[in-house]
Amino acid sequence: MEFIGKIIGVFLGWKVGGFFGAIAGLILGSIADKKLYELGSVSSSFFKKKTTRQDLFMQTSFAVLGHLSKSKGRVTEEDIQLANQLMIQLKLDDAGRKLAQDAFRRGKESDFPIRQVIREFRIGCGQRADLLRMFLQVQVQAAFADSELHENEKEVLYVIAEELGLSRMQFEQMIAMEMAARAFTQGGFYQKYQQGAYQGGYQYQQQNSGGYQHASGPTLNDAYKVLGVTESDEQSTVKRAYRRLMNEHHPDKLVAKGLPPEMMEMAKEKTQQIQAAYDLICKAKGWK
């Protein structure tokens, strides 16, 4: 029951301090509900019977990463290094690293039940749309880690998106947004932009193999794609899109909903991309 903390908090607060006590109880109860949700147990037939939402997020992420690596034909040394680098970046302890390694190994298996795993993950996350979207973005970012999205990887990502409730059009939009967003982290762009030292352009090129590979620095068109807007949209529309995306990717809010704290840096990077894209549009349009 998601609201048990609020109910108890309001009841006890009212008994102790009347109206203002109830308000205080509601606030404390809300905090308790978030913590209970974050640490609450969920069932997973693939990993183990009971686990926390945060461990489920972590294990599912690495299992899918293993599956994505295998989808290209074979798992390369580069794929394994990427997984290890991600574990280091997330600062996993020994127990967390073992969970991640086991999940990655199981994800590489030919009979990995991708749809079943994602369905259980979706249920375990309580159908939280922003958390599910963040999960998919983690996988998309991992697929682009070698600066190329293989067609087989794209099909696996679409299976995940489909199980998470996204349409093909929504999925294609997310891929386009991610390709554009990567322009804002390549070569330390965000830091350069903050210092006013950025010059140049950026575009993605489609390869003959059916995959995608980036070229060099971000364009205004990339910025529009990151926010999911068009050049003709009014300032109010662009601002609404910017605020919505910043709210969806707020690291603290995502952690409260079940994102492992170790993945906060990924969420922060996403907000930096969104901020840089919005700033670029405002500068080009002369908006304050």
UniProtKB/Swiss-Prot annotation:
Keyword Ligase assigned: no
Membrane-side (Cytoplasmic) residue stretches: 31-288
Keywords (A to Z) from UniProt: Cell inner membrane, Cell membrane, Chaperone, Membrane, Transmembrane, Transmembrane helix
UniProt topological domain (Periplasmic) ranges: 1-6
J domain residues: 222-288
GO cellular component: plasma membrane
Membrane-topology descriptor: Single-pass type III membrane protein
Database matches in InterPro entries: DjlA, DjlA_DnaK_co-chaperone, DjlA_N, DnaJ_domain, J_dom_sf, TerB-like
Transmembrane segments: 7-30
NCBIfam families: PRK09430.1
The protein's role, per its UniProt record: Regulatory DnaK co-chaperone. Direct interaction between DnaK and DjlA is needed for the induction of the wcaABCDE operon, involved in the synthesis of a colanic acid polysaccharide capsule, possibly through activation of the RcsB/RcsC phosphotransfer signaling pathway. The colanic acid capsule may help the bacterium survive conditions outside the host.
Domain notes: The transmembrane domain is a dimerization domain.
Record protein name field: Co-chaperone protein DjlA
Gene behind the chain: djlA
